[in-house]
């Protein structure tokens, strides 16, 4: 977003640490090819501490959640059509769990987790979401993007 004139700041409502829950596709998002056949509300692997605080000119907001107002956005930059996602349909929760484990000390230092119980609860939540995973829905954006660039 910043390269196209938008602004990014540290997230005011927290961070996505391995998971973004209840991402909601808005009306514009429902019309966009990236969300074709995607459930309107979904959970996805995610890992970020920042948020888009100002969209680039002509940007279209596609999806949001309680942590970040901008979870999906589309805009043009020169001759390029840009789709920005603040989550990872291309990753698995197992990869997110490894990232969390590798950053555990840093996450405690920055007070993302206040104690071991809170940390373990978060890990359990991610594992429970993995059990509920609908692979086709989770990877929908990747498929839609590949189909788009093929045509």
Task: Give, region by region, the residue ranges found by the protein language model.
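Cysteine-nucleophile active-site neighborhood
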Residues: 1-29
């Amino acid at each position: 977003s910043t390269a196209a004139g938008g602004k990014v700041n540290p997230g005011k409502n927290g961070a996505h640490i391995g998971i973004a829950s209840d991402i909601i596709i808005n009306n514009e998002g429902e019309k966009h090819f990236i969300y074709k056949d995607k459930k309107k509300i979904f959970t996805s692997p995610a890992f970020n501490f920042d948020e888009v605080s100002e969209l680039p000119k002509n940007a279209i907001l596609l999806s949001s959640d309680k942590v970040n107002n901008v979870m999906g956005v589309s805009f043009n930059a020169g001759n390029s059509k840009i789709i920005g996602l603040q989550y990872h349909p291309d990753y698995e929760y197992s990869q997110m769990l490894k990232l969390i484990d590798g950053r555990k000390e840093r996450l405690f230092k920055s007070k993302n987790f206040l104690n071991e119980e809170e940390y373990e609860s978060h890990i359990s939540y991610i594992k429970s979401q993995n059990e509920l995973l609908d692979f086709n829905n989770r990877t929908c954006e990747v498929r839609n993007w590949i189909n788009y660039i093929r045509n």
